[in-house]
Amino acid sequence: MSTPTGQPIGLGLPDAPLPVLAPRRKTRQLMVGNVGVGSDYPVSVQSMTTTKTHDVNATLQQIAQLTASGCDIVRVACPKTVDAEALPAIAKKSPIPVIADIHFQPKYIFSAIDAGCAAVRVNPGNIKEFDGRVKEVAKAAGDAGIPIRIGVNAGSLDKRIMEKYGKATPEALVESALWEAGLFEDCGFGDIAISVKHNDPVIMVEAYRQLAAQSDYPLHLGVTEAGPAFQGTIKSSVAFGSLLSQGIGDTIRVSLSADPVEEIKVGDQILQSLNLRKRGLEIVSCPSCGRAQVDVYSLAEEVTAALDGMSIPLRVAVMGCVVNGPGEARDADLGVASGNGKGQIFVRGEVIKTVPESQIVETLIEEAVRLAEAEGLEIEEGAGPQVKITR
C-alpha cells in the first residue's frame, strides 16, 4: 500500500526479515548403506513395507515401488524366523538400504546383522532382557559396521520408566532413549540414531526438542499410529514442520494407514515445502469461489495427472478466473486462468496465448516440456503425460 506520491504507508510495525529455517542441528554422522544420516547430509525419507517379509518377491516388488517414488531407506518387519531367513535375499537385492525392525526377540537382531541389513532398529521397551544383550549387539553391529536405531515408542515404554513417570511424557521418552544409548556407549559403540515416537504430535515435538538439546545423535522423526491418510498427513506435517524448521531431524518416516508409497509422497512434499529437498513438479491451484468459470477441482486433477510423471522443478498454476490469473500466480513458471470456455496460458506472469478450454491440458504439457528444455532440464524417459485427457 502506498500514498499518492508513491511512498509506502507505514503501519507502525518494524521491518522484519523474511523467515528462514534454523540451521541444522549438528549431529554425529552415520551411514545407512549408501545413505548418509546426520547434519552433513540431506534429510532422507523412509518407509516400511506392508508385505509379509518372508514373501521375498512381494517384499522386493514393494521396495521397488517405494524406490521409484523416491524412498531413500526402507524398513522391513521381522517378527518370525521365516522373516529372518528372508532377510539375506531382501538385503542383497533391494535397490535401497534395508533396515530390519526388531521387536520381542533379540536373536533376530543378530540374524539381521548377519543377513547384511544396512541397519537395525531395536525397540528396547519390548525386547526380552534387552539391556543384558546390549554388549553382544554392540559388538555384532560394530564388527559389521552398521548403525543401530534405538526406537522408543510411547506404547511400549520400559516398565521402569512407566513406573517412574506414570505415562509416556516427553521426559519419559527421552530418558528411555538416552538410557539405552548410554548402555551402547559404555560398550564403545556410538553409531546410534534415535527416535522417540508418540501419537500426539505435541508430545512428540516436545520429546524431540528435549532429545535434541541433550544429545548429538541423528534423529529419526515419526508420529506413531498417525492414522488414515488424511489424519496422518496432517499430524506428521504439523510435527515434522515444527521440528525441521528448528533444524531438528535427520531422517523422516510418515506413518499412514495407507499404501506406503503415499508415505513417500507426503514426506517428499514436507521436505520440498521447507526447501529441504529439491523441488519437483508443483501444482498450485486456487480454492475456487463464486468467480470461477470452470470446474477448478477437476481441471487441477487433470493437469496433475497429465504432468505427474515429469520430474522437473516447475511450478504450474491452475486458476479459475482471470482475477486469480497471472497476478496472484506470478511466482509460477507456467499456468492457466480460465473463463468463458477459454484459458489464458501464462508463463512467468505474462500471458502468451489463449486457447479453448478443451486444449488447456494439452497446451500446458507442451509449454512445460518447452520450459524444461529451455532450462536445460532433462526429462526422464517415459516421463511426461501419464493419461490422455478428453473433454
From Swiss-Prot:
Its cofactor is [4Fe-4S] cluster. One of its GO terms (molecular function) is 4-hydroxy-3-methylbut-2-enyl-diphosphate synthase activity (flavodoxin). GO terms for biological process: isopentenyl diphosphate biosynthetic process, methylerythritol 4-phosphate pathway; terpenoid biosynthetic process. It holds the Pfam family GcpE. It catalyses: (2E)-4-hydroxy-3-methylbut-2-enyl diphosphate + oxidized [flavodoxin] + H2O + 2 H(+) = 2-C-methyl-D-erythritol 2,4-cyclic diphosphate + reduced [flavodoxin]. Transmembrane segments: none annotated. Its EC number is 1.17.7.3. It comes from the Bacteria. Pathway: Isoprenoid biosynthesis; isopentenyl diphosphate biosynthesis via DXP pathway; isopentenyl diphosphate from 1-deoxy-D-xylulose 5-phosphate: step 5/6. [4Fe-4S] cluster binds at residues 286, 289, 321, 328. Binds 1 [4Fe-4S] cluster. Keywords: 4Fe-4S, Iron, Iron-sulfur, Isoprene biosynthesis, Metal-binding, Oxidoreductase. Gene3D superfamilies: Dihydropteroate synthase-like, Sulfite Reductase Hemoprotein, domain 1. NCBIfam families: ispG_gcpE (TIGR00612), PRK00366.1 (NF001540). HAMAP family: IspG. Belongs to the IspG family. Converts 2C-methyl-D-erythritol 2,4-cyclodiphosphate (ME-2,4cPP) into 1-hydroxy-2-methyl-2-(E)-butenyl 4-diphosphate. PANTHER family: 4-HYDROXY-3-METHYLBUT-2-EN-1-YL DIPHOSPHATE SYNTHASE, 4-HYDROXY-3-METHYLBUT-2-EN-1-YL DIPHOSPHATE SYNTHASE (FERREDOXIN), CHLOROPLASTIC. This is 4-hydroxy-3-methylbut-2-en-1-yl diphosphate synthase (flavodoxin). It comes from Corynebacterium diphtheriae (strain ATCC 700971 / NCTC 13129 / Biotype gravis). The lineage of its organism: Bacteria, Bacillati, Actinomycetota, Actinomycetes, Mycobacteriales.
